[in-house]
């Protein structure tokens, strides 16, 4: 039993050393549990520490088995509205890119994800709202070559977040701890209780 406990602690410390506090997602009214769960699972896979959500209906997000338990390892901060979410991210130095099917949107691979970055994803059916687009620093898109012009929101999140991971790996951002020591200890204590 002691070996399992020590192995678990080592694994938690290894994962925590790679967490990227300056890479996140902002989810605008993404309310389907399977999409939210899949996005959080991808966030965990690429090292996102905290995701953000705005749900205008005020409901508390729910998860399903798609998360693989990742909602325990990626914090989800729910904001009361878009302005509060943007204020929170901007005060922390994030550039916010909204995903959008627009002519003026940049190819998602042209963005430098090694800088503090939040990627905004919109509701499953409608995408990012005009209000959110107006607040964002820029719009990005995943080029589509087929007849279908959009991907499921959780698939789009995976595509973009793994590009961010690729860039960050190349820049060596996973090679050293990114959390300040106080936050590291706080999160470590929380994770060890789970």
From Swiss-Prot:
The keyword Metal-binding does not apply. GO terms for biological process: tRNA guanine ribose methylation. The keyword Transmembrane does not apply. Changing residue 124 to A: 2800-fold increase in Km for AdoMet. It catalyses: guanosine(18) in tRNA + S-adenosyl-L-methionine = 2'-O-methylguanosine(18) in tRNA + S-adenosyl-L-homocysteine + H(+). Both N- and C-terminal regions function in tRNA binding, but the substrate tRNA is determined by the catalytic domain. S-adenosyl-L-methionine binds at residues 99, 122-126, 142, 151. Catalyzes the 2'-O methylation of guanosine at position 18 in tRNA. Type I methylase, which methylates all tRNAs. Its EC number is 2.1.1.34. This is tRNA (guanosine(18)-2'-O)-methyltransferase. GO terms for molecular function: tRNA (guanine(18)-2'-O)-methyltransferase activity; tRNA binding. Changing residue 142 to A: No change in Km for AdoMet. Binding of TrmH to tRNA is composed of at least three steps: the first is bi-molecular binding and the subsequent two are uni-molecular induced-fit processes. Homodimer. Pfam families: SpoU_methylas_C, SpoU_methylase. Belongs to the class IV-like SAM-binding methyltransferase superfamily. RNA methyltransferase TrmH family. Changing residue 101 to A: 13-fold increase in Km for AdoMet. Keywords: Methyltransferase, RNA-binding, S-adenosyl-L-methionine, Transferase, tRNA processing, tRNA-binding.
